[in-house]
């Protein structure tokens, strides 16, 4: 049961003809008239009035909840907008991240290319048939540079 229905039931249950039966009504008004038809007519008039009041209250309750829902929706939308990023800001941030990643990737790619060239040069020195005693100092220098590089990391 929703809030609207709960409020409607609460108000409807508070109406006079809901609270007292015809018998109780008759007992309360017997001192004013003993004509049961007159009492029945009065009670029916009260029931008709309660039905009109119920109908009017139902319309007012519906309108109240429509207005309340509308206000809450506007409030939630404004709160959401105040705490969210615009699509443009998000796209700009993603482009900046992309640029940073591209720069870092280029640095890594350049380092890999440099090391690949050094290894290719080393391989050529080792496989060279002319690599004799005069190539050994160059090889030792390259090996020492790799040892230094490994010790730094």
Curated annotation (Swiss-Prot):
Protein's cellular compartments: Nucleus; Chromosome, Centromere, Kinetochore
InterPro entries, alphabetized: Nkp2/Cnl2
GO cellular component, one term: kinetochore
Keyword Coiled coil among record annotations: yes
Domain of life of the organism encoding this protein: Eukaryota
Main localization of the protein described in the UniProt heading: nucleus
Keyword field: Cell cycle, Cell division, Centromere, Chromosome, Coiled coil, Kinetochore, Meiosis, Mitosis, Nucleus
The keyword Cell division appears for this protein: yes
Coiled coil: 86-128
Membrane-spanning residues: none
Gene Ontology biological process terms in this record: attachment of spindle microtubules to kinetochore; cell division; chromosome segregation; meiotic cell cycle
Stored Pfam families: Cnl2_NKP2
Function in brief: Component of the kinetochore, a multiprotein complex that assembles on centromeric DNA and attaches chromosomes to spindle microtubules, mediating chromosome segregation and sister chromatid segregation during meiosis and mitosis. Component of the inner kinetochore constitutive centromere-associated network (CCAN), which serves as a structural platform for outer kinetochore assembly.
Family stated for the protein in its record: Belongs to the NKP2 family.
Subunit structure: Component of the inner kinetochore constitutive centromere-associated network (CCAN) (also known as central kinetochore CTF19 complex in yeast), which is composed of at least AME1, CHL4, CNN1, CTF3, CTF19, IML3, MCM16, MCM21, MCM22, MHF1, MHF2, MIF2, NKP1, NKP2, OKP1 and WIP1. NKP1 interacts directly with OKP1 and AME1.
Note: Present with 1630 molecules/cell in log phase SD medium.
Protein name: Inner kinetochore subunit NKP2
Source organism (scientific name): Saccharomyces cerevisiae (strain ATCC 204508 / S288c) (Baker's yeast)
Taxon lineage: Eukaryota, Fungi, Dikarya, Ascomycota, Saccharomycotina
Gene name of the encoded protein: NKP2
């Amino acid at each position: 049961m929703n809030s609207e229905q709960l409020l409607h039931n609460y108000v409807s249950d508070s109406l006079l003809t809901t609270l007292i039966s015809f018998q109780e009504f008759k007992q309360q008004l017997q001192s004013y008239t003993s004509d049961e038809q007159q009492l029945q007519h009065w009670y029916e008039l009260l029931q008709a009035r309660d039905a009109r009041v119920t109908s009017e209250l139902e319309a007012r309750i519906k309108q109240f909840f429509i207005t309340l829902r509308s206000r809450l929706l506007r409030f939630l939308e404004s709160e959401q907008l105040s705490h969210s990023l615009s699509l443009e800001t998000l796209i700009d941030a993603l482009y900046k991240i992309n640029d940073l990643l591209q720069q870092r990737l280029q640095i890594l790619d350049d380092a890999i290319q440099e090391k690949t060239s050094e290894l290719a040069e080393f391989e050529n020195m080792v496989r060279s048939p002319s690599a004799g005693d005069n190539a050994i100092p160059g090889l030792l220098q390259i090996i020492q540079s790799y040892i230094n590089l490994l010790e730094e990391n």
